[in-house]
Amino acid sequence: MRQGPHHDGSELYVSKDQPTLGEKVRLRVRVPSAYRFEIALVRSYHDGEPRFKELKQSSKTEFESWWEVDLELTNRVTRYRFLFARAESFEWLSARGLTNHDLHSNSDFQIVASDTRPSWLAASVFYQIFPDRFAKSSEKKLPEWAVARSWNELPRDKSKYTGIEVYGGDLDGVREHLDHIEELGANGIYFTPIFPATSNHRYDAASFDEVDPLLGGDKAWFRLTAAAKRRGIRIVGDITTNHVGANHKWFRKAQSKKSAAERNFFFWNRDFKWGYVGWWDLPSLPKLNFQSKELRRRLYAGKNSVIRKWLSSKYGLSGWRVDASNMAGVHKGDDFHDEVMHGIREALDASHDDAWLVAENGDFVASDLDGRGWHGTMNYQGFFRPFSIWMSDSVDLAGGFQGLPIKPPRIDGNQLVESITQFSASIPWHALTASMTLIDSHDTPRFRTIVSGDRSKHLSGIAFLMTYPGIPSIFMGDEIGLEGRSGEDSRRTIDWEDRSRWDLALLQSFKDLVKLRRTQDALIRGGLRWLDIGQDHLLFLRESKRQTLLILISRAAISLDFDLSSSGYRFEKTLFGPSQEGTRLRVNTGRATQGIWSLR
């Protein structure tokens, strides 16, 4: 793989982590000694007009030189790229890498002035819990809509029971098993919705005012948040801003009284036999109409709004995951998406000065991540989908493959890296590092099933999850090897009574990798530099001011002999995987392999 000049948004290359408008930042570029050029310039935009400024060499070794330039942030978002010119040829260095032709500015590096992020986020690993399936503290009487299931029965996938099978997991059950989460090493919990509803997933909220009594109600919530706080575990909630359930008190009032303010919260349309617009044309999920200022006030703008209430010290959330974020405020000729997104961010910042706002958007809209809205996204399209396709054994997964109505294609390592680079290049570095990375969730097949039950490939998945920039999220039960062929099937329970069914070797590896993610400086705040990409392997560096890590991820048997001496590195310590020393990485294995080493 050709090595050329490198720059990214991490601390090695940008002098200020959270600069303010009008400040100067120093940009640095690392250039290998073998790379030849006559002049290096930075092109940046000032009030929409491009300007050029020459870089100066600041240091040089046998292996590389460093070049730098100061840049004043005159606009809220500053886009820039570097030009390396020589006789009759040139190359641009943008967030997409090196190119020898002109390209659009949407792949420029970006710095967002006066943007803030939670102080605790960078060193966090989250554990996703689907409340009905994690742990049950006691038996409860079920409502009429629910179909009771025994704890260790498998979900009936895609059937008339979809959404109404109830296993009885609750918040006291979570509290009683916080030891498991803490021992795993996770310091954050992301809950799918906890509000009253008429489904097991609770994305059809009947109220945003209290916790579902089936989960133990507000009292169980307070017990859980207090216990989690004592352990240093933060909790992120899940909110539907695009729709509510047909039993939501706002919707019931709107139906019963045409003069009610709530009437304007929804779209009424006689083209549907039920008389209103539902999300995906589902009558169970009335879509919210953000033309209503009163809806905005109740949901996020008002002092006692839903968003603000649950972020208060009393209710204890440290952030929100926003469901179907790309659709909220958008309906035919209406497009209030940006207003809603910015309003939610303003409400979050006003009510909690250190909270995380992450959006579900399977199609990844880059403009949503410009510092005014979401801190990050659930990185489905820029991480999960290309990586899962690369790792997949083409098993027949239900419902297509994460938005693609086809079986998983076969791609090589270069296609994988090109895919994830396309998406990371379209957003600021700090939006990437504040995004949630995941190898599965409650809406996807389990990763263990994607790789046909192969433990070594599963381990490659968790190793990449813990070493790629972003905030890792582990779907409950992944750590013990749970499987599932679809989103519904993946929502399996954890058998707490019979641990002989757990993959204990995998669990220990999870713990080791989570610990590395939370303690190694280069994984917390380092940049990303690709060294070698093959059909079946990825080799890359994560580098901070204090540490350099080498990471190997393979999906199959590999034979690799890679010389580090040309870059001036040698092995210092093996942190995970096969032991290495000297200046050559030598790996010859008959299965998928992972390795993490510190270099000096």
Where are these regions (language model features)?
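Substrate-binding/active-site clefts of carbohydrate-active enzymes
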Residues: F126, F130-N187, I194-Y315, V340, ...
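Glycan-association/targeting regions that enable binding to alpha-glucans and other polysaccharides
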Residues: M1-Y127
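Active-site groove signature of glycoside hydrolases
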Residues: N304-H331, T437-S441
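Carbohydrate-binding surface patches
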Residues: K16, R26-R28, L531-S567
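Hydrophobic faces of well-ordered beta-strands that scaffold small-molecule active sites
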Residues: V125-Y127, I189-F191, I235-G237, W320, ...
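C-terminal beta-strand-rich structural cap/linker in extracellular carbohydrate-active enzymes
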Residues: V31-S33, T78, V125, E581-R600
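Aromatic/acidic polysaccharide-binding cleft in carbohydrate-active enzymes
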Residues: D132, D370-R372, G376-Q381, T433-R455, ...
